[in-house]
Design a protein with these regions (language model features):
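Acidic-basic catalytic patches of nuclease active cores, encompassing PD-(D/E)XK
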Residues: 1-44, 352
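Alpha-solenoid helical-repeat scaffolds
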Residues: 3-6, 10, 232, 316, ...
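Membrane-embedded glycan transfer/ligation machinery
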Residues: 10, 14, 243, 320, ...
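Long, charged, glycine-rich C-terminal linkers/tails
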Residues: 25-48, 346, 368, 422-429
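Charged, often flexible domain-edge or linker segments that flank or initiate folded functional domains
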Residues: 53, 58-60, 64-72, 77-89, ...
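Class I S-adenosyl-L-methionine
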Residues: 250, 280-355
């Protein structure tokens, strides 16, 4: 089955979304909004299946509560097409939803998922079974629009009954999407890196050296250096995109993330993140990895689609608790995927911090911070007695390696401290000396402190 739809088919998807919104505006339903057009691409790149549904129903105007995803095809794709069905169900699972709809203008089918992740048909609509071709879609437009309204009204009843469940965008990001990005792209990027290294001895030597120092971190997870590095690339891009969208409502410099589109290259994306860093710092989160631009187009479009999804799905309107869930979810995925075997458990970190610190007014340094569990706990403990600003500014952290610092920096941030500069930097602990100059940038002004 062709994955990237043509312009004609895309226009019908957009029409379907527009008509759905018209129906919703004329009724008072649990379903409040329809969207999804921003993640539909017409690029012909041999791309994998899209990550997100063609049409998404939302439970609020801000589009932060997701109700259901629809997959849309034209009548020349049979409603019983297995790939069509599986694609819709896969996306429902990725969005943590228990239902999905497939629609080909001839038929519409509602699937429901049970606790064992098994889907079954809950309802099928056959009213427009006489629509058999793309030409018929235009001829009988008023007919399928009438059916669409009937479906929306029926779906409202299913949601009222509790039979169909929703998902909150914050939980979806924290629990599902980043893991999905890794599963979809790790092997593809790994193979691309391997082929590129065959023609580039500098790249080959760099990954060899990187693997020598970090192999032990992956020994229970990855035995292939290219797959390990590919996983780091996926997490790095995902974390940068996620964090930029999280802070853009508080940091105007991060609004540059909205410039991402299907014409943006990885190199141009890195330039955008450099501009964001210049305006609001968070260098350890937004800085690029070496060779992270060596990524196939089919994988790169996943990151663009993810950014578009965040751009248009209510992340600006999440409350502090939801934003904190996203931050903590990103941390958990990063630790689990990269060095979960060696991450300090939070309870142990609390004990170590309390055993090590005599006066909580003192400045604290963790010079081998890894993914930041210990400095995070130090900040949380300090905040019980000190202001958030005093707590953050008196806890320092560094590590020899770059990627853990991205996770550590996210780990040390809470929704109430986004405007405060973390004292975190890359440095080898054994060469760290009193008097070394460390540059910290104010995230509000972009000026050096």
């Amino acid at each position: 089955m062709e994955v990237i739809i043509n312009e004609n088919e895309r226009s019908w998807v957009i029409d379907l979304i527009s008509k759905t919104n018209f129906i919703l505006s004329s009724n008072d339903l649990i379903i409040k909004k329809a969207g999804g057009e921003s993640t539909v691409s017409t690029q012909s790149t041999g791309r994998k299946k899209n990550m997100f549904p063609d049409l998404i129903l939302y439970g609020n105007e801000e589009k932060s509560v997701i109700l259901q995803g629809w997959e849309i095809k034209m009548p020349d794709t049979p409603i019983e097409d297995e790939e069509f069905i599986k694609d819709a169900q896969r996306k429902a699972v990725a969005l943590n939803l228990n239902s999905c709809i497939i629609w080909n203008f001839t038929y519409a089918v509602l699937y429901i998922r049970n606790e064992n992740d098994e889907f079954s048909i809950l309802k099928q609509w056959n009213t427009t079974s006489y629509i058999q071709s793309r030409a018929d879609v235009k001829i009988y437009q008023s007919d399928w629009e009438q059916l669409l309204e009937e479906i929306i009204i029926e779906l409202n009843s299913y949601f009222i009954s509790g039979q169909l469940h929703n998902a909150v965008i914050g939980n979806v990001i924290a629990e599902n999407i980043i893991t999905t990005l890794i599963k979809r792209n790790k092997d593809v990027i790994s193979e691309y890196l391997k082929n590129s290294a065959f023609c580039n001895n500098v790249l080959s030597a760099y990954i060899d050296n990187w693997w020598i120092h970090l192999k032990n971190e992956y020994e229970h997870d990855e035995s292939d250096k290219y797959k390990a590095y590919a996983k780091s690339i996926v997490l790095s891009w995902a974390n940068r995109i996620t964090f930029a969208h999280i802070i853009k409502n508080r940091q105007n410099g991060a609004l540059l993330i909205n410039e991402f589109n299907y014409d943006t290259t990885p190199r141009e994306a890195n330039e955008i993140f450099s501009r964001i860093t210049a305006k609001c710092d968070f260098y350890n989160i937004f800085s690029s990895m070496n060779y992270d631009e060596i990524i196939p187009v089919v994988s790169w479009y996943d990151f663009i689609e993810y950014s578009n999804f965040l751009k248009n799905n209510g992340i600006d309107h999440l409350n502090q608790e939801a934003l904190q869930n996203i931050l903590e979810g990103s941390i958990a995925v990063g630790k689990r995927e990269i060095n979960g075997q060696y991450a300090t458990p939070p309870e142990l970190a609390k004990i170590l911090v309390r055993l090590s610190v005599q006066d909580w007014r003192d400045t604290i340094l963790d010079c081998c911070c890894g993914t930041g569990t210990i400095p995070r706990e130090a900040i949380l403990i300090k905040k019980n007695q000190l202001s958030a600003k005093e707590a953050v500014e008196s806890v320092w952290a560094c590590d020899k390696y770059k990627y853990p610092l991205q996770i550590a920096n996210i780990s040390m941030i809470e929704s109430d401290t986004i405007r405060i500069a973390n004292r975190i930097f890359q440095h080898h602990a054994l060469s760290l000396s009193v008097g070394d100059d460390i540059i910290i940038v104010d995230p509000e002004t972009g000026e050096k402190l």
